[in-house]
Amino acid sequence: MQSIKYHLRQTKINMNRTDRIERITAITDKTTDWKQQIPWKGELKSMPVYDIPLDLLVYNKYNGRILSRTKSLENQKQKIDVESDSGKKIIEKLLWDSKEERNKKTQISIANFGQQKVGIITKDGIIIDGNRRAMLLNDIQNDGFLSKKKLPKKYNYFKAVVLPVTLEENPIEIEELETKFQMGEDEKLGYNATEKYLKAKEIYLRLTKSSKIILNELNDEAIKKISDWMGETNSEVRKYMNTMVLMDEYLNYLEYDGIYTQLDSREDQFLSLTKWLNTFYGSESKKGFDGYDDTDVDDLKTIAFDFLRIRNSYDGKEFRNLAEGNKEKHFFGNKEIWNNFSTKHFETLDRIPEESEIDFNTNNLEKHLNARDNEFFETSKFGKSESEFIENINNNKTLVGYNRASDAPEKLVKKASQAFDAIKTGHSSFSKPTVQNLIEELGTKVISSLKDKSTSKVLDHIINLLESIDIDKIPDAEVEKVKLISKKITSYCYHNFDKGL
């Protein structure tokens, strides 16, 4: 049962709406010579433009420019009441922060010359197009609370076309109009990258009256409408749907469901991953290693999600190493490299301590989650200067490079020699058993490659090694062992070379 407080609040909202409708109607009853053409009910209509007092305007909290922000707040159970002063301040702050530098320039222009682009509102004052301009006008009247700059207060009204309906009376028609104005080709340039995906999802769910997007059952009619409204092709809108579903899955993976702010700065990586999964799932693509299956693609997605999470801690172009391009260019194209890379990744993941619980009640969830993601990255360093996730990328990038240059052994051998020359053999860590074992393993590989091509070169190399030994410097603890080995060498040479040749 709803509270008395709720009913009182609704009564006040209805009274405010009624008052706004009456006052706006009094304005629109007057004649005006200024007209603006807008698409309405399937045709381009010439509608009058009026000067609407700022106090009659109500922000649209689902404006495409800040949709990811308002949805994120609401998914934190934070109610945004656009009729209240507190709700109004939240929307204004989100609008200001969405493009601060651009807002500063536009606000100066508006203060000096007035609003140059006409907005659109409903008959009860809900802003359909022009949230940002209205916010800038309000901020000027509020002595630059957001901009921290006092500007001339010459314009205390909003130039707008007034639609003959409320939002509730014709939601689909208004959605179409709003989308065409907000997400047209010119406007999209000023929007956060995530907004267009989220906007397409919201429209699709509203048109189809669905609770979620099912990719293999997309409604063609809804896709066509969205493509018309957004000025995109059908295939582009389908790509939006695919990408948005993956974005939601990523947020679910991190338990950040509905917190769309955590998608910022990751659009390129999501587009790449969406393309990879469409390529690899369900069939064996020539771009993947031979014999991979869907469980390998599952691993690719999980690993990609981890690298999406730490996206702000490395150059985003490195993400391409996972699976971008032809098979010889990436990790997923070579079975040995992929197994090496994925095994190391999951080993690193297992070593990271369990993370603390997410504090969904924090005042700034975006900051809290960013700090949490950064801690995840820092922990992966395990006291070293570089994250093991990044080390793993770099190490396997080298292997991919070696594979691609396998037809040029001279270059690879030179690189290997230069790499070995760079090692500080006098450093104490060089004597560690693990390092010495690796050196021995490397030496065995070198000798093995020589013996297949030239036995005499191997023997010459052995003689050079024997001649380089300073007998006087052999440690006492090794003398007896050296004697045994030297006898073994003599015996081996006698029985295998003197008698055999």
Walk through the language-model features, giving the residues of each.
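Short, charged/polar connector segments at secondary-structure boundaries
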Residues: 3-150
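Glycine/serine-rich loop-strand microenvironments at binding/catalytic pocket rims
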Residues: 101-124, 293-297, 307-335
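Amphipathic alpha-helical "recognition" segments
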Residues: 145-158, 197, 206, 231-326, ...
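C-terminal structural cap/anchor segments
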Residues: 336-426
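Charge-dense, extended regions
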Residues: 391-501
